[in-house]
Amino acid sequence: MIGDYHVHTKFSSDCNSEPEELIKKAISLGMNEICFTDHVDFDYPPENGQTIFRINTKEYFNTLAALRDSYKNRIKIKIGIELGLNPSIEEMNSSFVKSNDFDFVIGSSHIINGNDPYYPEFWEGKSIKEAVMSYFEAILRNVTTYENYDVYGHLDYIRRYIPDKEYVYVENDFYEITEMIFKNIIFLSL
């Protein structure tokens, strides 16, 4: 089986792709399955006064269910979500997952202490090592708080946005905390 379970569409604030175009591309690449996992981050700070990373779940499900039916003989289509995790919104996230019939849930950490590492403000006032450690500490809190996800997404998200391109990321600097993260993730899957 060849598939992709981390696919964003126009339903995510960071993507403009039409779901049907992505389905056609997946078929052309020989994929058997595709799972749409658009972003929902309830605690993402508004941009220019606009709430982002929220979806209209009814429209999302209706659109993807219709496409699933149209392409059922060519590719298996699943409806999932990439959910931004944070202990302060655990109840809201859990309720959201339970009230929707997602086939697959990616848990991710995008917001750490109110900031996304994508933005320069996240990095201000701390060393790169301190900032990266705060990211892993947030993930550890999330994996010990949450159970309503199938896989944890892009643990290396922070590495994309390290502002100093000369910085050498040394995995052993974060060995202990990443070891605890992995043990919690593995325990959850048992």
Regions found by a protein language model. Name each.
Residues 13, 99-102, 106-190:
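Domain-core and long-helix interface of multi-subunit machines
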